[in-house]
């Protein structure tokens, strides 16, 4: 088993050159593209994408996934514009060499039971998956707070109900902690067979504060060991959120991003997990 390290490089800096310099200094040869020059990935122009491709080639860095915001809208919002945005980010992913696109399963109205929206969410995610299939893309659904798929049971039910090869799961331990879920004990058994991608961030259960991997209650060490034992060979993507965290992204800065990368690399060394 060998895992591949990546990260949300816009947590380092809005500037792509500084992002790439910090990644390469920490021997991280992939990035998850969420934004560059403070432009969100779904809004990047063809000229932007060309500049990104050139900079990546010069730095020897590749794109592991598109960190899109697709599905981070209210469940009652019109779906058409979201399908158009997905087509655009799938095109960008194709140009940059990755089929993987992070997505979400829609914000549920505050105070309402998520189950009330189950069929609507399944229909919407099925429509996204159909677009992804046509573009040769793989949607990696992230468990995010306050969306339909925020707890493992709904994540698994969603993926199994849509039943498309284009809809898989990404695993975010910190988000599970912030939803009162034990990531390895409760979520991993339900989601392992659906996992195509793993986000690396940890959190404290009592406050929800995000901390480097292994320093919180996210059972990151246990999850990495289980992934090792199962032969997982996918991406581990750093999303540190060590300086700022919000519903549409986070920020760490170069020094804190390096601290997060080194914490993950130390865990991998402890667990004897090869990485590249």
What do the PLM-derived regions correspond to, one by one?
Residues 1-29, 53, 57-60, 97, ...:
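Histidine-acidic metal/acid-base catalytic patches
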Residues 1-6, 63-73, 105-108:
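N-terminal small/glycine-rich loop or linker at the start of catalytic domains
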Residues 3-6, 36-39, 73-76, 112-114, ...:
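A short, structure-level motif marking secondary-structure boundaries and short turns
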Residues 11-13, 35-37, 69-72, 105-109, ...:
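Active-site-proximal loop/turn and secondary-structure-junction residues that shape catalytic pockets
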Residues 14-21, 55-58, 75-169, 178, ...:
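Active-site acidic/histidine proton-transfer and metal-coordination neighborhood
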Residues 32, 65-67, 102, 140, ...:
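Conserved beta-strand positions in the central sheet of alpha/beta enzyme cores
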Residues 33-53, 106-112:
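Glycine-rich, proline-tolerant flexible connector loops at the mouths of alpha/beta enzymes
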Residues 42-46, 75-80, 112-117, 180-183, ...:
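Short, solvent-exposed loop/turn segments at secondary-structure boundaries
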